[in-house]
């Protein structure tokens, strides 16, 4: 999976490559067979509304790698993830930052957060803060964040997110993925 992602130009950072190789993705998508779990181009839907529309998924591995490359997580960074999904991305973030307790992930659906909490604990990342709440409001209790990643489909960057990013020369870096298709990076005015 990782070699195919790298051939496509993602997982450029050695730390991103390492965590993708070291993390058993299939444990976060237990209902998917191994071929689907490790297909670099396929998202795995893990939760649906009653009418069949998808509510939550594990993003395609190529997209996960692209987001993490762009997020450029450094050891010790405090991170907010909007959109818990399966907990897979939070486990990667915990490894990149070096401490699971520096990662906060938030989702509005209690079933999604409960399953992600279980998967994270089983994988050894029970110290990740999994919050049930409105991700559009961010999570000020653990702010300021050095990095913020939205794995949901935001129409815009809410003012609350900007307020929760670390200020100054090392200002926080947000990455958002509209519609889980294209990757956009936003920077605050004055941030390089």
Spans of features found by a protein language model:
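Class I SAM-dependent transferase core
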Residues: 1-80, 84-85, 89, 112, ...
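Residues in well-ordered beta-strands of folded domains
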Residues: 39, 172, 187
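A residue-identity detector for tryptophan
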Residues: 41, 62, 155, 161-162, ...
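Short C-terminal domain-edge/linker segments immediately following a structured domain
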Residues: 50-52, 162, 179-181
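Conserved nucleotide-cofactor-binding alpha/beta core module
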Residues: 69-172, 176-178
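Class I S-adenosyl-L-methionine
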Residues: 183-192
